[in-house]
Design a protein with these regions (language model features):
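C-terminal motif of bacterial Sec signal peptides marking the signal peptidase cleavage site
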Residues: 29-32
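Bacterial N-terminal signal peptides that target proteins for export
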Residues: 2-22
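A short, solvent-exposed, low-complexity linear motif enriched for acidic/polar residues
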Residues: 34-262
Length: 262
């Protein structure tokens, strides 16, 4: 069973069990991951946003012409996010603050896609984000049919006008390690952003070697599988956590990276 709602163009799908896990995670966090007293660290509303961007728009652009490749849509199915408390990363089973999965969304649409949660001031050593396969019952409300049984679907065109589609069924749990050993979420710095760097994801894709059918490039397990492997090898490396100082769900002009995948 799933429960869905719409936020802008983003279809959010929550699994009821996650709400129980979230409550348990909050309790574990309050007892084991925060420092100071309850009075000293009152809870506040925090926000975790998600967006696709390009660190090299001359190579891969998002939505606008100008790159060797232009990505018009970036559909992802994202499950639970776990924040690992400072000092817990060295333990075999680190305590985590679990946030409900965002679900399915187009992260190149320009919409502000976010999860809001209550938390007390604390430091974290890492974040874990899980990609999952889109289920048949989730294909609704504008979600492309081809996303079914896949976790990632990118669509766009090359500079010469050739359309392309990439479908991946990879389901990794991507771990973002803190750049400086730990990062803090506080009432004054409560908004963060997970960025998906499409330039990193597509950097090693050899478009010239792609097999074209009907003038289009399809990259999947069935066609151009070597190019899919190039993409999937860069998946974790293209995900990072940033501050979102103005809370607009986009990368700040002066980027402050908190954690990164490898």
């Amino acid at each position: 069973m799933t429960r869905g709602r719409r936020l802008g163009m983003l279809c959010l799908v929550f699994r009821p069990i996650l709400h129980g896990l979230f409550a348990l995670g909050m309790a574990a966090f309050a007892s084991g991951c925060s420092s100071g007293t309850e009075t000293g660290n009152p809870p506040f509303q925090a926000e975790l946003s998600y967006t696709a961007y390009s660190s090299a728009p001359q190579l891969v652009a998002v939505g606008d012409a100008g790159g060797q490749a232009v990505v018009d849509s970036a559909w992802l199915d994202l499950d639970t996010v776990a924040l690992l408390g400072q000092g817990r990363c060295v333990e075999p089973e680190p305590a985590a603050l679990s946030l409900p999965g965002l679900g399915i969304g187009d992260h190149a649409s320009g919409q502000h896609n976010a999860t809001r949660f209550a938390v007390s001031r604390a430091e974290y050593c890492a974040l874990e984000l899980t990609f999952v396969l889109a289920q048949p019952e989730q294909i609704q409300g504008g979600v492309p049919q081809d996303l079914q049984w896949h976790s990632v679907m990118l669509a766009g065109s090359l500079a010469d006008g050739t359309p392309f589609t990439l479908l991946s069924a990879a389901t990794p749990t991507v771990r973002l390690e803190a750049d400086a050993g730990s990062f803090e979420i506080s009432a004054k710095q409560a908004k963060t952003l997970i960025g998906f760097d499409l330039a990193t994801w597509l950097a090693d894709v050899d478009w010239a070697s792609a097999t074209r059918v009907g003038g289009a490039i399809d990259i999947s397990a069935q066609q151009n599988a070597a190019l899919l492997a190039q993409f999937e090898s860069n998946l974790a490396r293209g995900v990072a956590l940033y501050r979102d100082a103005d809370g607009d769900g986009k990368l700040d002009d002066v980027r402050v990276r908190l954690a990164h995948g490898e």
